[in-house]
Amino acid sequence: MANVFDNSSYRDMLKMVFVIRDDLKMTKGEIVSQCCHGAISAYEKSKKYSPDYLKRWLKNGQVKETVKVDNENEMMDIRENATAIGVNYYIVQNDKRQKCNTVLVIGPAPNYMFESLTRSLKPL
């Protein structure tokens, strides 16, 4: 069976991470909907701001990961750190009137860039 990944090291492989607020107690369907919206928006944003990462991510299996945070403050701290290191991100809001931030999508970016951002978070 052929390997879909090239010979890049794990550290340099790319992924997209979905940081999901656990305090909102969203249903599985709501989480899927929010993550799908975020994936498309992060993809579109990546075409402009990080096209090389996007091309590599598409070529190497489009790895995705979901993690959870306890609250919005924790999610926004991660967003600030992503901004500081230059990682693409997109924040999903469930209702434009209420502007409730539900999911932070980060990437695509190399694994090593996530070490300081999401390593300590639990998978969803």
Curated annotation (Swiss-Prot):
It catalyses: an N-acyl-L-alpha-aminoacyl-tRNA + H2O = an N-acyl-L-amino acid + a tRNA + H(+). Keywords: Hydrolase. Belongs to the PTH2 family. SUPFAM superfamilies: Peptidyl-tRNA hydrolase II (SSF102462). This is Putative peptidyl-tRNA hydrolase. The keyword ATP-binding does not apply. Pfam families: PTH2 (PF01981). Signal peptide: none annotated. Gene3D superfamilies: Bit1 (3.40.1490.10). It is an enzyme of class 3 (hydrolase). Its EC number is 3.1.1.29. It comes from the Viruses. The keyword Transferase does not apply. One of its GO terms (molecular function) is peptidyl-tRNA hydrolase activity. It comes from Fowlpox virus (strain NVSL) (FPV).
